Swiss-Prot record:
Function noted in UniProt: Formation of pseudouridine at positions 38, 39 and 40 in the anticodon stem and loop of transfer RNAs.
Species the sequence originates in: Actinobacillus pleuropneumoniae serotype 7 (strain AP76)
Protein known as: tRNA pseudouridine synthase A
Keywords: Isomerase, tRNA processing
Catalytic activity: uridine(38/39/40) in tRNA = pseudouridine(38/39/40) in tRNA
Domain of life: Bacteria
Keyword Isomerase included in the entry's annotation: yes
Active-site residues (renumbered): 51 (nucleophile)
Single biological process term from Gene Ontology: tRNA pseudouridine synthesis
Keyword Isomerase: yes
Binding site for substrate: 109
Quaternary data: Homodimer.
Entry EC number(s): 5.4.99.12
Entry's family note: Belongs to the tRNA pseudouridine synthase TruA family.
Length: 262
């Protein structure tokens, strides 16, 4: 049978999602816990391979197993064998043609900036601190130039392995909740470091170092060296993955927790 899981994790102490030799990853911890429940080796496939230090509130994975377990056992049993910073949120049986990555039609990320002169001791690895005052309205206005299908070479990591830089951005919203600025972006898919590179350049606009139209110009140049530095991993969350309704993938609050109702 094939099972899909919803996964939440604090990526602060992990070297990204993907299993690697000699360092801890989220995938490694999840596979170890699932293998205990299944009493057999389990390999998982995820919707989006997040980088070192990046978090997830809406990650989706699937795995195949011959072990017959109640769905609640895949949740409670796995959580009992996971560290406190990784948790299974739900489990469903899915059809054989479901794939956590290739069946997805969109991914959604949120980047959280604590915009205050003094840093906060709360969630030091859960938000990115930026002490200069940022104009979130200008950041939002600039972000609208990125909507639709475009070549995102200017916001693509140098070592990106994707065959094409073209992606379709469905929405990009920048809002403020007190001292927190939230960059909310959804696209069919993302090139490597795309969200953090976009945020880095939007910060330049928000601080007033560049005009709103600079983002439009950057997009047209298709040159990563002209854009701002990559924003820190702290503050980035994979919050949602979209699938066709026929797969029956549950929808939960987007998160992170302190933004769950916004």
């Amino acid at each position: 049978m094939k099972i899909a899981l919803g996964i939440e994790y604090d990526g602060s102490r992990y070297f990204g999602w993907q299993r690697q030799d000699e360092v801890e990853s989220v995938q490694q911890k999840l596979e170890e816990a699932l293998s205990i429940v299944a009493n057999a080796p389990i390999e998982v496939f995820c919707a989006g391979r997040t980088d070192s230090g990046v978090h997830g509130t809406g990650q989706v994975v699937h795995f195949e197993t011959q072990a017959i377990r109640p769905l609640q056992s895949w949740c409670f049993g796995t959580n009992a064998n996971l560290p406190d910073d990784i948790a299974v949120k739900w489990a469903v049986e899915v059809s054989e043609d479901f794939h956590a990555r290739f069946s997805a039609t969109a991914r959604r990320y949120r980047y959280i900036i604590f915009n205050n002169k003094l840093r906060s001791a709360i969630l030091p690895k859960g938000v990115s601190h930026y002490h200069y005052e940022l104009d979130h309205q200008k950041m939002h206005e600039a972000g609208q130039f990125l909507l639709g299908e475009n070549d995102f070479s200017s916001f693509r990591a140098a070592k990106c392995q994707s065959h094409t830089p073209w992606r379709n951005v469905h929405h990009l919203n920048v809002s403020r909740l007190g001292n927190y600025i939230v960059v909310d972006i959804q696209a069919n898919a993302f090139v490597h470091h795309m969200v953090r590179n976009i945020v880095g350049s939007l910060i330049e606009v928000g601080q007033g170092r560049q005009p709103v139209e600079w983002i439009q110009w950057l997009l047209a140049q298709r040159d990563r060296t002209l854009a701002a530095p990559t924003a820190k991993a702290e503050g980035l969350y994979l919050v949602d993955v979209h699938y066709p309704e026929r797969f029956g993938i549950p929808k939960t609050a987007l998160g992170p927790l302190f933004l769950a109702n916004n």
